[in-house]
């Protein structure tokens, strides 16, 4: 029996992207996590859309569990760039975020600061 460790779903996804490979994702707007589970073997990642859909924290958590069961990263498109949108999603277990309507380097830095804990950021 070998004791090899598999890369995390996020590390595998990043490596695939860094290698220039095509990554196929599924946009999730439905609240039922069965959608994520059903698509799990056919995609490289999920992006759960909170910008254009309403979803409870419980539904979001169900999608995270389904993605984790399929060893796929779950990215969340938040409705805005502020800490109140970003922090709860990261605290709930998102593997990454997609932030819409970012138009400047200063806005990008604000988003990064919202994602990182002090002293590198302001996430609390």
Predicted feature residues:
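Alpha-helix-loop-beta-strand connector modules within alpha/beta enzyme cores
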Residues: 57-83, 87-91, 115-120
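Conserved anion-binding
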Residues: 84, 96-124
